[in-house]
Regions:
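Transmembrane beta-barrel outer-membrane domains
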Residues: 14, 70-72, 109-111
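Short, surface-exposed beta-strand-loop junctions and turns on beta-sheet-rich folds
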Residues: 96-98, 135-136
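Short, low-complexity N-terminal intrinsically disordered segments enriched in polar/charged residues
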Residues: 1-25, 29, 33, 37
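A solvent-exposed, acidic/Ser-Thr-rich amphipathic alpha-helical stretch
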Residues: 32-97
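Short, surface-exposed loop/helix-turn segments at secondary-structure junctions
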Residues: 102-110
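Short beta-strand or tight-loop elements
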Residues: 74-77, 112-116
Length: 138
């Protein structure tokens, strides 16, 4: 027999992986509605100069992506997640490529590598970010 608690943890980890992938999609598509839905109403985000709520972050980062870049592409790499009931914490490595607008000739691409340090909460069966902090490693 399979342990139901183990199954719950494995399902939670997959749902959290889907959540972090949806975050990348929301940023890269500048989809503020999608991105905002990934954050708990009481969430907090620290990313670059931004320090505020998840909802405010969703609006601000999508406006930046639409106006400053011709494209962005975030790719999650390995992820560590520790689940504890309806809460979890994790670290996800990410590589992001961005192309600024207004370049002549061969465009310059910005490549960034770092980690997201996250806390997650499950409410009514849905995982959301309660805390997300980006650490730029290079």
């Amino acid at each position: 027999m399979t342990d139901p608690a183990l199954i719950d943890v494995l399902v939670a980890k997959q749902q959290i992986a889907d959540l972090t992938a949806a975050y990348c999609r929301g940023v890269d598509r500048a989809d503020a509605a999608l991105l905002g839905s990934l954050f708990h109403p009481d969430s907090h985000v620290e990313s670059g100069p931004f320090n505020g709520s998840g909802q405010d972050f969703a609006r601000e980062i999508c406006a930046i992506v639409r106006t400053v870049f011709t494209q962005t592409s975030h790719a999650n790499a390995h992820q560590w997640v520790e689940v504890d009931g309806d809460s979890a914490k994790g670290e996800t490595y990410v590589t992001a490529l961005a192309t600024p607008r207004g370049q002549e000739g061969d465009p310059v691409h910005m490549l960034t590598g770092g980690r997201y340090l996250d806390r997650f909460v499950r409410t009514n069966g849905t995982w959301q970010f309660i805390e997300r902090r980006f650490v730029c490693d290079w």
